[in-house]
Curated annotation (Swiss-Prot):
It catalyses: an aldehyde + NAD(+) + H2O = a carboxylate + NADH + 2 H(+). The keyword Oxidoreductase applies. Disulfide bonds: none annotated. Induction: By EPTC (S-ethyl dipropylcarbamothioate). It comes from the Bacteria. Its EC number is 1.2.1.3. The gene is thcA. This is EPTC-inducible aldehyde dehydrogenase. InterPro entries: Ald_DH/histidinol_DH (IPR016161), Ald_DH_C (IPR016163), Ald_DH_CS_CYS (IPR016160), Ald_DH_CS_GLU (IPR029510), Ald_DH_N (IPR016162), Aldehyde_DH_dom (IPR015590). PROSITE patterns: ALDEHYDE_DEHYDR_CYS, ALDEHYDE_DEHYDR_GLU. Gene3D superfamilies: Aldehyde Dehydrogenase, Chain A, domain 1 (3.40.605.10), Aldehyde Dehydrogenase, Chain A, domain 2 (3.40.309.10). Belongs to the aldehyde dehydrogenase family.
Length: 506
């Protein structure tokens, strides 16, 4: 066990500033109106720094810097851009513990996740896109013996990115790495609930990028996010967050006819066929862990497996074993490497989760385990903690809506057809899980479930080279994978005639 000292205390490996301005043109720039907002840590509920409360004027300053940088950056060779991305990855790796601690303190998630998942994944995404942009090729087509069509990938120019609060650094890197690799300049707005871990990161890597290529402006959605998303000075907007806000982002983008990438809500089914209990072996243990994945990152994952579907003939036995597994999840200080589940990202989210739990109880859903706020005592008593909670009910209950917390709603199904029917009975289609020892069943279920990613005999893996995105109301476009480069590029066609004679029309 390792317990990290809190930022700013004796023996701490990093400290936050007491106040953060915006990062514009590789400099710290105070908000135009001089306003700041408090930023509490979810670990204790206490404020630890103040952050720029930006407005449209600050967005304009960032756009000025981005537009000044975009032409030269877009013409930088892909080899040079790849070198810079790899340098960013190296610098992050050298400072992994510091960045992980900042992320855990700002967001509340266990440091074992930031040390072993979030930040290493972010590092790998930079390295992946450094390689992907080097490997990307244009094309040519021979129209006839004298005419050739050449196709080039060109950057869009200046793009806007709005980042969620559940994975502040990793979700930022999902967007930053391909956008930078493709040669775009960026104005990025973090979530106001988790505004500073990305600023700690930029303090580490900022000097590696030319001034103005990456600009970070903090603030609230209406005051800063809307001016960015609706600006006629951006060529694309990428957003991760709730579906309601995603609709607004689309409206703003439509006014300027610019493309959007939207990664929105989810209520992912996790389907367990009866053969998962065919033997008491490693696979069974893996499936039980797969059930408990609803509590990863405190359930604050768009693809959290928050609807568990268990086949009738194993329902009672599997649920009893899953409840034991859930009760064994260790909740505690997020800075302790033995802690498995930490704090919710904000007090508002805490209250939302608790209200849904009460709704579930009122609707008649049965609490198998959890169902209350976690009172950890001591200096954690003001933090935002919820017990991992397992409900049983049916798919029509409100607890089967997106809660975005460590809550799973469990129901049963008779056969394959009913499993698919229940799994698809949702507005969302971001992720899903299928568990079966029968490869044919697992494959068919994966194809029949309406979701952009279906984990099969696994869950919550997010490699850089696997496409991620939603069906239905879970979003538009994809993130990660080589195909993501095209989301930040436009195609230039040069149609060239090498003939000496006129075409003969006039």
């Amino acid at each position: 066990m390792t317990k990290y000292a809190r930022p700013g205390t004796a023996d701490a490996i990093m400290s936050f500033q007491s106040r953060y301005d915006n990062w514009i043109g590789n400099e710290w720039v105070a908000p135009v109106k001089g306003q700041y907002f408090e930023n509490p840590t979810p670990v204790t509920g206490q404020n630890f720094c103040d952050v720029a409360r930006s407005t449209a004027e600050d967005i304009e300053l960032a756009l000025d810097a981005a537009h000044a940088a975009a032409p030269a950056w877009g013409k930088t060779s892909v080899a040079e851009r790849a070198i810079i991305l790899n340098k960013i990855a190296d610098r992050m790796e050298e400072n992994l513990e510091s960045i992980a601690l900042a992320e855990s303190w700002d967001n509340g998630k266990p440091i074992r996740e930031t040390l072993n998942a979030d930040i290493p994944l972010a590092i790998d995404h930079f390295r992946y896109f450094a390689g992907a942009i080097r490997a990307q090729e244009g094309s040519l087509s021979e129209i006839n013996s004298d005419t050739v069509a050449y196709h080039f990938h060109e950057p869009l120019g200046v793009v806007g990115q709005i980042i969620p609060w559940n994975f502040p650094i990793l979700m930022a890197v999902w967007k930053l790495a391909p956008a930078l690799a493709a040669g775009n300049a960026i104005v990025l707005k973090p979530a106001e609930q988790t505004p500073v871990s990305i600023l700690h990161l930029i303090g580490i890597i900022g000097d590696l990028l030319p001034a103005g290529v990456l600009n970070i402006v903090n603030g609230f959605g209406v005051e800063a996010g809307k001016p960015l998303a609706s600006s006629p000075r951006i060529k694309k907007i990428a957003f991760t967050g709730e579906t309601t806000t995603g609709r607004l982002i689309m409206q703003y983008a439509s006014q300027n006819l610019i493309p959007v990438t939207l990664e929105l809500g989810g209520k992912s089914p996790n389907v367990f066929f009866s053969d998962v209990l065919a033997s008491n072996d490693d696979y069974q243990d893996k499936a039980l862990e797969g059930f408990t994945m609803f509590a990863l990152n405190q359930g604050e994952v768009c693809t959290a497996p928050s609807r568990a579907l268990i086949q009738e003939d194993i329902f009672d036995e599997f649920l009893a074993m899953a409840a034991i597994r859930t009760k064994a999840v260790r909740q505690g200080d997020p800075l302790d490497t033995d802690t498995m589940i930490g704090a919710q990202a904000s007090n508002d989210q805490l209250e939302k989760i608790l209200s849904y739990i009460e709704i579930g109880k009122a609707e008649g859903a049965k609490v198998i385990t959890g169902g209350e706020r976690a009172e950890l005592g001591g200096d954690l008593s003001g933090g935002y903690y919820v017990q991992p909670t397992v409900f049983t009910g049916n798919n029509k209950m409100r607890i089967f809506q997106e809660i975005f917390g460590p809550v799973v709603s469990v129901t049963s199904f008779k056969d394959y057809d009913e499993a698919i029917e229940i799994a698809n009975d949702t507005l969302y289609g971001l992720g899903a899980g299928v568990w079966s020892r029968d490869g044919g069943v697992a494959y068919r279920a994966g194809r029949d479930i309406q979701a952009g990613r279906v984990w099969t005999n696994t869950y919550h893996q997010y490699p850089a080279h696997a496409a991620f995105g939603g069906y239905k109301q879970s979003g538009i476009g994809r993130e990660n994978h080589l195909m993501m480069l095209s989301h930040y590029q436009q195609t230039k066609n040069l149609l060239v005639s090498y003939a000496q004679k006129a075409q003969g029309f006039f």
